[in-house]
Amino acid sequence: MTIKLLAIGKTDNKQLQALIDVYQKRLEFYIKFNLEIIPDIKNVKNLSEAQQKQKEGELILNKLNTTDVLILLDEKGKQHDSIGFSNYLQKHMNSGIKQLVFVIGGPYGFSEDVYNKARGKISLSRMTFSHQMVRLFVIEQLYRGFTILKNEPYHHR
């Protein structure tokens, strides 16, 4: 299985990007992983929230293969503790899917088309985080999940 993380817009903060790079490298020891950045939409000032979500949704859906399993990072999604998330990953690996795709949406969330395509939604917290920080948190939790599955000492139970 491959895991892909799709995100809208580049990471501007160099320190944050350095941490993302560290955890991405660690994660790639366990599984094939790809972080793909979808460029920000130009001229968003001229678009309504709905129009921006629709345009971002089209860009997201164009990055998917027909067999991909799409999971949205969404404030209304299911929350897991780290062990529960590792079990969630294991369940997907056991299902025989080729690629599990996590998506961090734009500032207004996802279009209806993206919600309809998704097979699940997860939430990292009830708190709000910057979308750039969420990238780091997701990659770190993926790494943590695999260390839990391998009974490695990174996670303290």
Language-model features: where?
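N-terminal beta1-alpha1 ligand-phosphate binding loop
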Residues: M1-L27
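Loop/turn-to-beta-strand initiation segments
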Residues: T2, I97-F102
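Conserved RecA-like P-loop NTPase ATPase core
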Residues: L5, I71, G105, V138
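General small-molecule cofactor/ligand-binding pocket signal
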Residues: L6, N34-E36
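Short glycine-rich anion-binding loops that position phosphate/pyrophosphate groups of nucleotides
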Residues: T11, E75-K78, G106-Y108
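S-adenosyl-L-methionine/SAH cofactor-binding core of RNA-modifying enzymes
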Residues: K32, P39-K98
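Proline/glycine-rich low-complexity loops and linkers
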Residues: G105-G106, K117
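Structured adenosyl-cofactor binding patch, chiefly the S-adenosyl-L-methionine
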Residues: E112-H156
